[in-house]
């Protein structure tokens, strides 16, 4: 596995849940970045560890960390700023844990839902290569929200690829977009009249009968984020 030695960064950190988790695993140097502050009751970590900044503008004189994490944030940044967002993220570390919403995944203020291949091209342009090491092991683990199981990839600066290969970890040069069954069920139910939506029932059938697992604990059939753009 790829580990860090006590330093971590995340772009779009919200209340700092990833920072809290990193600290619990021994990280000692932490920094979070987001566009807007969150209420005190939503904080998982000290507020002073979180910097409020414009993630769409190129950051200068960035500190370097052992790993940078951005999960389900990039879709909230307009496509005209996507290159800058990824450049900022890579400016923090040679190792980046990244996920972003697929098209029609849905959510609040999703203005740039894109396929994995779209983001992969942007990382490749900065000399990073993908390692698809999380999706298969966690695909059917309903304790984890499906969008993490569907979208999480590790991006690593190419100079570290051979080191990872010596540890038996191979890169995925062209990672593919994978649509999780829960997203399919969500999309189908969203298209149904409200009184006919059966996401939780459908997901229970999927998890308990098809794969022998527990049903997910949340109904993700809330509104779709981008329809407001089409008016």
Cite the ranges covered by each PLM segment.
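Flexible, glycine-/basic-rich loop-and-beta segments that form/coincide
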Residues: 149-194
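Conserved S-adenosyl-L-methionine
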Residues: 128-139
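K/E-rich alpha-helical interaction surfaces of small helical-bundle regulatory domains
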Residues: 112-127
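Membrane-proximal basic amphipathic "stem/tether" segments
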Residues: 175-231
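Conserved SAM-binding loop
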Residues: 1-108, 117-120, 155-157
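A generic fold-level signal
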Residues: 45, 147-148
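Short proline/glycine-enriched turn/loop segments at secondary-structure junctions
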Residues: 141-145
